[in-house]
């Protein structure tokens, strides 16, 4: 067995105008595919550890040292992107009632949540991700990680993710990351967020 690159659940151009087809094609077929290939190359060196990336990245000390950073970078990159694709929707969706209530409880209002999430995504220096997670106490929390690090390694369960690597937005938004973040909020798959939230609580 090997880690497989998942197909996008929609056409490359399905998220336009927010996310353009060329970016989606490059992002999925080149960047994500490279993470998958490099993950498999690392795992082949240690077949005894298996291929459950979520379990491995939940406690990176259990990953053999010679492939640990490769799996953090590439295994994390695969998991992060596989989740990211599912969190995007060609059809505009309203926030589901359960998630809306949880956001109100945690942040005071949806606008306050959006402001804090945007700040986390904008403030992540260099490459990384912004996240809405369910923490160990079962509470919603906004966080960000560098590079392809995953909140799973901190014992947190991601339910919303935004890739803020420049490869995710530079063709369309150039250096204006805030416009990309604003566009992201227009194409979130809130049904998937709800599904992840219910499973993580």
Curated annotation (Swiss-Prot):
Which positions are annotated as binding Mn(2+)?
27, 81, 163, 167
Keywords in UniProt for this one?
Manganese, Metal-binding, Oxidoreductase, Secreted
Example GO CC term: the record gives: extracellular region
- Which Enzyme Commission numbers does its entry carry? 1.15.1.1
Record's Gene3D superfamilies? Fe,Mn superoxide dismutase (SOD) domain, Iron/manganese superoxide dismutase, C-terminal domain
The GO molecular function terms of this record are: metal ion binding; superoxide dismutase activity
Keyword hit for Nucleotidyltransferase: no
| Top-level enzyme category | oxidoreductase
Localization recorded for this chain is: Secreted
How does the cofactor attach, per the note?
Binds 1 Mn(2+) ion per subunit.
Q: Which reaction does it catalyse?
A: 2 superoxide + 2 H(+) = H2O2 + O2
Identify which cofactors the protein needs according to its UniProt entry.
Answer: Mn(2+)
Q: Which family does it belong to?
A: Belongs to the iron/manganese superoxide dismutase family.
Listed under subunit, the entry gives:
Homodimer.
Q: Name the job this protein performs.
A: Destroys superoxide anion radicals which are normally produced within the cells and which are toxic to biological systems.
- Provide the protein name: Superoxide dismutase [Mn]
| Gene behind this protein | sodA
């Amino acid at each position: 067995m090997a880690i497989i690159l998942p197909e996008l659940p929609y056409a490359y151009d399905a998220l336009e105008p927010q996310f353009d087809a060329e970016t989606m094609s490059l992002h999925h077929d080149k960047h994500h595919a490279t993470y998958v290939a490099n993950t498999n190359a690392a795992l082949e060196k240690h077949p005894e550890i298996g291929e459950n990336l979520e379990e491995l990245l939940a406690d990176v000390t259990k990953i053999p040292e010679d492939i640990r950073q490769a799996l953090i970078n590439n295994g994390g990159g695969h998991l992060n992107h596989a989740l990211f694709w599912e969190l995007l929707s060609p059809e505009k969706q309203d926030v589901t009632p359960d998630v809306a209530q949880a956001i109100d409880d945690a942040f005071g209002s949806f606008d306050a949540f959006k402001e804090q999430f945007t700040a986390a995504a904008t403030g992540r220096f260099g490459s990384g991700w912004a996240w809405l997670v369910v923490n160990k106490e079962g509470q919603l929390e906004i966080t960000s990680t560098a590079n392809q690090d995953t909140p799973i390694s901190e014992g947190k369960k991601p339910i919303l993710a935004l890739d803020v690597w420049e490869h995710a937005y530079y063709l369309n938004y150039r250096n204006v990351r805030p416009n990309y973040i604003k566009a992201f909020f227009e194409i979130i798959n809130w049904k998937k967020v709800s599904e992840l939230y219910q499973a993580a609580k």
